[in-house]
Amino acid sequence: MDDSASLQLRPFRSGDAEACLDLFRDCVHRVNSRDCTDDQIEAWASPTIELESWRARFDDRFAYVVIENESVVGFTDMTRDGHLDRLFVSDDHQGRGIARRLVERLLSDAAEESIQEITTDASITAKPFFLRMGFSVVREQSVECRGAWLTNYRMRRATHVEAS
């Protein structure tokens, strides 16, 4: 990351939840919309997602944000058993190594906790990134999300493998 001095990776704080939810919705609308229908986007990034339930999903997880100019520009979280749940980077900040840095941090946490592999359910949009990070596809899935069906990919990666 050439401009890493302006980017700060730090643990998620409860006060970050609203910014992360806003970033998630924006990213789904601006980035994932390339691979999803309008109905799928509206269901996935629904305005009915409640902030407190969103915030609670970060509890007891490895969770990080990347900050630039006091704004959240990326975030991720992983369960204590190694399931990478969410990984989103602002559309305006993609291609700067932020997602790679977040995943590398989770891989480090997993290795420290003796978690042998990380799994994720990657969107169509995110699948190429995860492949570049050394993940492999276990299976294609069709999952229901607030009345819409989305395609994603169960992927996994051993924690000790180097990314390409």
Label for each model-derived stretch:
Residues D2-D3, A148-S164:
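Terminal substrate-recognition subdomain of acyl/acetyltransferases
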Residues P11-G15, D22-D92, V103-R105, D109, ...:
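Acetyl-CoA-dependent GNAT
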Residues F130, F135:
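Conserved active-site tyrosine of GNAT-family acetyltransferases
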Residues T119-D121, S136-R154:
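Conserved catalytic-core motifs of GNAT/GCN5-like acyltransferases
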Residues A5-Q8:
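Extreme N-terminal starter segment of soluble prokaryotic enzymes
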Residues G97:
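Conserved G/P- and acidic residue-centered "switch" motifs that form tight phosphate/ATP-binding loops
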Residues A126-K127, R146:
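Short secondary-structure capping/turn micro-motifs that flank functional sites
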